[in-house]
Structures are given as C-alpha cells and as structure tokens.
Amino acid sequence: MLLLALGVLLSGPFAMAQNPQGQVMDWLYEVDQYVPDQGADNRLEAGQRSLLRVLSRTTGLVSIPRTPAVTQALSQPQRYYGQYVYFSPSAVGSQRRQRIDNAKIANQADLAVRFSFQSEAVKQLVRQAKLPSWWSRRPSTLAWIVLDTAQGREIVDSSQTEMVNALSREAARRGLPVLIPSMDLQDSLLVSPAVVWGRFTDLLDEASARYQAQYYLVGRFSVQEVLGQRFYTGEWVARSGNTEDSRFLRGVSFEEVARTGVDMAAQRILDRHLVFGNTVSQHDLVVKGIGSLEAYAQLLDYFESLEFVDGVTLQEITGDALALSLQSLAGLDQLRQLLVDDGRFQSPEAEAEAEADAEIDIGTGFSELVLPGRQQTKTVLQWRSDT
C-alpha cells in the first residue's frame, strides 16, 4: 500500500483519499467525548464541547468567539446534532480512542459518546455568527519527520505509535488529513534521514509528488531523555510550491511538536482556502468539457456539495460548454482558486484559447466579458472528467 494512514478507520483524519487533492472530510461533523455516565447534564456538557470542536474544524479558528449566535447555540447543542451514540472505548481500536476529543484531559473512563452533527445546521450557525468558512474538501499534508537520538537519526513511520497517536489527535482537532510516508523501498531509495535533516527540498518535492500531496511538513528534531521523559528541540518547515514557513521549538514534548506542526499545516491551507464575508455575490462562470447529461449531473452535484456555493443557475449551453451563474460567499479570484486547487477543474491551457472564446458573441457563445444588461467578468474553466 502506497500511503500509510495514521488512522485505521476510514472515517478518520488519516483516511485514504480517492482524490488526494481534495478529500471530502465527512468526519468533520463527528466528535467523540469521554463521559462519566449517561446523565443529561454530562451529555449537555459533552454536546457543548463537541459543537465547539465542529465549529473550530469548519471555520479554521482555534478558538471560537462567543458571539450571541454561538452562545445561544451552546445552550441547546441538541439542535445541531442529528444523533448521539454511547459506546465503550475499550471496544474500539486504539486509534479511535486516541481521537476522543477530551482524551488528554479526561481520565480513562469506561464510557464515551459520539455526536453526529448536521452539516446544514452548522453551516447556518456559522453564517449567523458571521464566522469564516473552511470547506470540507481538504488537501492532504505529508509529514516527513526525522529524529536525532542517541541511536542515530531515523525517519518517523507508522511503527512509532507515540508520535502517530499525537499527530492523529492534533489532525482530528483541526480537521486536517495528515499522512506519513510509507518508507517502503521506493521511498527509502529517494529519501534518507540525511535528506530530511538537510532539507533537500528538490528530493522531498519529488518524493511528496508520489503521494499527490500539495503540502508537506519537514520536521527535524533532536531528542533528549531526562528522567524517563523525552524532550524535543528542532524545527518545523511547512512547504507548498516554492514557498515555506518555519518555526523553532526547544525542549518540548512530542504533543507540542505535533500541535505546532499540524497548526502550521492548517494555517498554510487556510491562507488560500478560508472564505470570509457574509455577503453572497454572483459570479459568471464558463465550464467546458460537459459533453453528456451524466457529466452535467456530476457538475451540479459537485457545486451543491460546496459550502461556499449557495446556488447555481444555467444560463446557456454551447457545445460542451455551459454558461453558469454561481452565488457564492467567495470572491471571484478565490472561487477560481478553490475550484482549481481541488483538482476537478483546470484553467485553459493556452491563452489563445481564452482569447478566442472572448471574441464569441453572447448570442452564439458566452465567453465574452459582457452579459446582457450588465458588465461582469467571466471565468473559464475546464471540467476534468477523469477525477
């Protein structure tokens, strides 16, 4: 198997992706909590904590401001979840236990509850509270981590359960899919501990492309053991494209290492994907490559799945191209960026093609920049039927 997922449940933050460029994160709306019993008061408190966690995952905010809408919602969290199910933590796998939201602060109780929240209700709450929106289609981040210990340097893989569990908890907290390399023969031939430690980004770029990861982390940490406790000193680098950010840590636990790395990865994605604003705008879009009713249905289903798209109106059809009007919270530039980043669309490959389209009159085509009765800019994108 190419990807070694950090979790074993297909509903978890380290699930395999059909399209690694933009996984649909269904588990964003599911939260597990330890509870002492099945009493209503404890369920209310657990529901409140879980609602805050879902809001954090779907807005990208580490701390949720207590706006009037949020405060009112916290008084009745049951309005936002569709069901809750109690379960025994000992009856589930260790990876799922590690992702129980309050696992670090709760005693190892014999009872836990899973809340399944309604995505539409949460979406409306986010709008009412005037919070930003982070869509559920999220790219994976690959984590290359090398540890310098008394025994030498080694790359972290799935056998190091302490690190895996810490990364799993933090990825679940932020709602981010994080992968670790399999370190099979192909990886080992290309990436050694020296490559990660030396930050040879040309080799790491090549190795990360194998996993179709647009974003990756490089962690280089020296490990010191004092009285049975391990302390980590070193640097995280978050990289995508040709740009990167770094952060230095000194003498911290691996939990802090994991938290910092996942937060850096999340912020790098949020800088491109977080949608601000509460005003819906109309954008004109031309989508090419829609050659059948099946492709048209797939396109509409895709748009309906996007949190920041409120409506789609078909204006005109010419050949395999559709002229659409989209109602969205995102501005035009960000809308285009989000659609292309997700991997289902691509920009026209040749500027000449775009220029030729712009010369078509609205009566015979629709790629001209002027629509009847109003001046408005159009964006032309190619639908990728192979994704």
Spans of model-derived segments:
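Bacterial N-terminal signal peptides
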Residues: 2-11
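Sec/Tat signal peptide C-region and signal peptidase I cleavage site
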Residues: 13-17
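Amphipathic beta-strand/beta-sheet edge segments enriched in Tyr/Trp
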Residues: 26-32, 36, 208-259, 330-336, ...
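Short, well-ordered alpha-helical segments
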Residues: 30-76, 169, 203, 253-265, ...
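N-terminal segment of the mature soluble domain
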Residues: 48-73, 137-197, 299-323, 327-329, ...
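Signal peptide-directed extracytoplasmic domains
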Residues: 63-145, 156-158, 162
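A short, hydrophobic beta-strand-centered structural micro-motif
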Residues: 79-93, 180-182, 196-227, 316, ...
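C-terminal soluble interaction/assembly domains
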Residues: 244-254, 265, 273-274, 279-387
